[in-house]
Amino acid sequence: MKFLPRSLLILALCAFSPLSWSQGALDPPRYDYNVLCQKRANVADGFSREAMMQCLASQRHAYELIRKNWHQLPEEVQTGCDEQTRATRVLDYVSLHSCIVTQLRRIPPAPQ
């Protein structure tokens, strides 16, 4: 039992490591976009179901675009864009996708 606190510390450190964000670069990071969309759907006139549905649809679409190509992205793009998105504290797949597209444009084409 004397090792229990140390084990919990190691487990906690692993849970918050950058490697756990991308799950070994096989899957994109997981963001809870429901919270984001709920915040965006709360407008001056109250809750907008239409805004909520549009937000959810755009997040799902961006996630699917990211998921399809995630394993092919350079690790520095995966990590860099995830870190940039998390730094904004708005876990948003549309922003993550925009970052990925921007970073990929900066990579020079392979010589032929």
Cite the ranges covered by each PLM segment.
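Positively charged n-region of N-terminal signal peptides that target proteins for export
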Residues: M1-R6
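Mitochondrial intermembrane space
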Residues: L19-Q112
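Bacterial N-terminal signal peptides
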Residues: S7-F16
